[in-house]
Amino acid sequence: MELITKFKDVLLIFNMKKMDNPSLFGEIQKVIANAFNLPCAEDVFDNQYSYIVSIDKDEDNEVVSGYRHILCKNARCGKSFSLNTFKYYDFSSDFSQNYADYTLELGRSFVNISAKKRIWGLFSIWESGLGPLINYQTEHNSIQYILGQVSLKENIYDLESIKAILKMFWVNFGTTALLIPRKPTSSPAELETFNVDSKLDFSGDYKSDKVKLTKFLKEKEQAKPTLFLSYADLVDGKKSGLSCFLPVYNSLLKCYEMGFLLKISEISPENREKYLRSSYNPQAFE
């Protein structure tokens, strides 16, 4: 377990595996179980994935937030992949042959809802953990893409809002290539034609569609899908920078999930400067 860097000189950002610190890993699992209302958070992937985790040194080393990650090439098993995403999506031959070896999967993320500094949550992980990770893997393993899933939980969003969010991202970034959902919740036609009123007549221009969606959700007193928007904003809403795949339903977490693939070279200069910091401890990722 190695320190990557610090966030605001208060949160310590580490990269670790289960075997590095079983005690801390146990605390992480308790936080995840509490955040997602699970009896047990540990799963079959925890022995192979790494965790980037933020620790509050001023609060008795309280776990604040974290992200799970792995290089797809390290999870390849013949024609299969031991990846969380692979549970929900089948990989096309194009993805397996031309993308997988250059792709970093970001697994589940979490924030300790009881932590004193939870407001820094995933931002601290992105700025001081994932940014350095992406820099390192780009330089040392020729990584070009980020693969993951973004969730919309039923206890946070009503179904109408979920469909509106999925439609907006599908209209702007949707593709049926590369990843094929094993059990899709919607067809492309269903996503494209869903409409509740004229406010949801998305044009495919991300910036204007983002305004429409945000206004629609605000009127319904529903939260903005921050993580969804963050990935799109990283590439300034460019279609060449982000691909979204047909949604699936996660019955364990009771949420709809949409897979995505982000092209690292399309991250905007402003966001590169903000997140992809070059000052960090590279030994944390060796």
Task: Report the location of each language-model feature.
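Short amphipathic alpha-helix that is part of the acyltransferase structural core
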Residues: 2-64, 68
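A short helix-loop-beta-strand connector motif used in the catalytic cores of GNAT acetyltransferases and
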Residues: 44-53, 76-78, 239-242, 251-258
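Extracellular structured ligand-interaction cores
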Residues: 49-51, 64-66, 101-106, 143, ...
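Carboxylate/His-rich catalytic cores and anion/metal-binding grooves
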Residues: 62-82
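C-terminal/domain-terminus segments
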Residues: 125-126, 130, 228-229, 235-277
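Acyl-donor binding region in acyl/amide transferases
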Residues: 75-236
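Short, cationic low-complexity segments
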Residues: 278-286
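Catalytic micro-motifs at enzyme active sites that drive phosphoryl/nucleotidyl and oxygen chemistry
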Residues: 40-44, 51, 90-97, 247-249
